[in-house]
Amino acid sequence: MRFISPALALLAVTWHTVPVSPKGSLRPAGLHRPDSADVVAVAEAFHAALAAGDPPTVLRLLAPDAVILESGDTEARAEYAAHHLAADIEFVRAVPGTREVTGVRVEGTVGWVTATSTTRGEFRGRTIASQGAELMILSRIGRTWLIRAIHWSSHRL
């Protein structure tokens, strides 16, 4: 059994609903928004899918070769799906938190979003009080932005 690190606290976020176009498209509704808004919308949709307990949407937003870096470990998308996605969903749904996007940048077909978070609550009998940081790197393939890498880090408050 893997220890749930404080870095998971970054996942427990409060989000507003992000409209997604019908038929499960990865592109949010409002097709004419600037790229930076689209990049942020994909990051928000990822967190909203975690909070909703929606693994298929989480995985659709991750590129097939995506990597997740957390607590000194690196996982490929398939490893994340098989080993930690369910625990991340459980954590996000159990522990309240806030998240704030602190930056977004787009250079051609690559974009990145930085965010910070604060999470407080209890999870599996442990008190959680942490501050987190997130970096998501996305790439645009055609008109679709996909998450290529996520780096989560956190520390106790």
What are these regions (language model features)?
Residues F3, L11, W15-A29, W112, ...:
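Short beta-strand edge/turn micro-motifs at domain boundaries
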Residues R77, G121-F123, H155-L157:
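A short local loop/turn or secondary-structure capping micro-motif enriched for an aromatic residue
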Residues L62, G72-D73, A115-T119, H151:
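A mature extracytoplasmic/lumenal domain signature
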Residues F3, W15-P64:
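Short, low-complexity N-terminal intrinsically disordered segments enriched in polar/charged residues
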Residues V67, A82-I128:
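Surface-exposed, charged secondary-structure patches
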Residues A43-D54, L62-A66, E70, H84, ...:
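Sec/Tat-exported extracytoplasmic proteins
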Residues F46, V58, A66, Y80, ...:
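Hydrophobic pocket/interface hotspot
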